[in-house]
Every structure is written in structure tokens, then in C-alpha cells.
């Protein structure tokens, strides 16, 4: 059975291990020391999802009144997914549990800022699929670009213009 609970300082080692060694889409920005640098400016409301003793996912978030935001102290956030054993069905269950939690906590809105694909070790959109499947909608889109420094490519005029 999938459960979720708020992050606690006692979870730091487990959280950082998952972020650094076992996630498909986390970056160093999700390590607790980096996140807690902003502790005085954001009400941390990060969540830990588990299935029995197995860690299933993390959600780096802050709370602002009745809004849960994929952490306000970071450029992006979203669901931190493991590199193995997590697919669309699990993502749907996690998002369902997140919605139930928000209802119970009188949170009326979730702002989700996914990790750009260029930072994924194993790119996937299981989280985006689950959000859309559960009735979520896109409210904002951002452009991400990457340059392979081992094979630089000069952007053409159309790329520069957007």
C-alpha cells in the first residue's frame, strides 16, 4: 500500500542517498543541504512516498498558504523518481496519493515544475502523464536547450529568434 508523509530531518541521509544514487531525474539541487539553504524563506513541505519499507518517490515542495509548490526556492522540482521499478501505473498512484494528501491538508492547488529532461539520467514523462491523467493542466511552459560540448553546433538564425 502506498503511503506518504512529510519529510523529517531524520530522513536526510535516506533522502540524499535516493537523490544521488537511485533516482532517474534528480540533480544536486535536491540534496537537503542545498534545499535547506533557503529554509528561512520557504515553508518546506517535502513529501516521502513509500510502499511498506520501500522508498517509491520523493516530492520536493514548499507550502504557501493553500498552495503546494514544487519547491519555491528552486528553479524546478517535481517528483523524484527511482531509476528502477517506477512506471506510469506507479506515477498515477503517487499523484493520486498526493491529491488525497492535499485535500486532507486543505491545499487547493499544486504548482508542479518538472525537472527538465536534459538533467534526467533516464528520461521519462511518467509524472507528466499521471498529472494529465488525473485532471491536471498545463499553466506555464518554459524552453530548455542543451549544447553538447563534445560536438558543438552553432544555432541557426531561426533558433536564435525563437
Task: Label each PLM-derived region with a short phrase.
Residues 25-39:
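Short, basic/aromatic recognition patches
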Residues 1-12, 124-162:
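Acyltransferase donor/substrate-recognition loop-hinge adjacent to the catalytic core
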Residues 70-73, 91, 121-125, 156-158:
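Short, conserved acidic/polar surface loops in the N-terminal third of protein domains
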Residues 115-120, 152:
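Short, internal active-site loops enriched in acidic
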Residues 98-101, 107, 135, 140:
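Conserved alpha/beta cores of soluble small-molecule-handling proteins
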Amino acid at each position: 500500500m502506498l503511503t506518504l508523509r512529510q519529510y523529517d530531518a531524520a530522513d536526510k541521509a535516506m533522502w540524499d542517498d535516493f537523490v544521488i544514487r537511485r533516482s532517474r531525474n534528480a540533480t544536486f539541487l535536491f540534496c537537503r543541504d542545498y534545499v535547506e539553504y533557503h529554509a528561512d524563506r520557504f515553508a518546506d513541505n517535502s513529501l516521502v512516498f513509500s510502499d511498506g519499507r520501500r522508498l517509491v518517490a520523493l516530492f520536493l515542495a514548499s507550502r504557501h498558504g493553500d498552495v503546494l509548490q514544487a519547491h519555491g526556492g528552486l528553479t524546478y522540482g517535481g517528483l523524484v523518481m527511482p531509476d528502477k521499478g517506477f512506471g506510469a501505473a506507479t506515477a498515477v498512484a503517487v499523484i493520486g496519493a498526493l491529491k488525497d494528501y492535499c485535500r486532507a491538508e486543505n491545499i487547493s492547488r499544486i504548482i508542479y515544475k518538472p525537472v527538465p529532461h536534459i538533467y534526467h539520467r533516464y528520461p521519462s514523462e511518467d509524472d507528466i502523464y499521471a498529472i494529465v491523467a488525473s485532471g491536471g493542466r498545463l499553466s506555464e511552459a518554459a524552453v530548455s536547450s542543451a549544447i553538447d560540448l563534445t560536438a558543438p553546433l552553432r544555432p541557426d538564425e531561426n533558433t536564435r529568434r525563437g
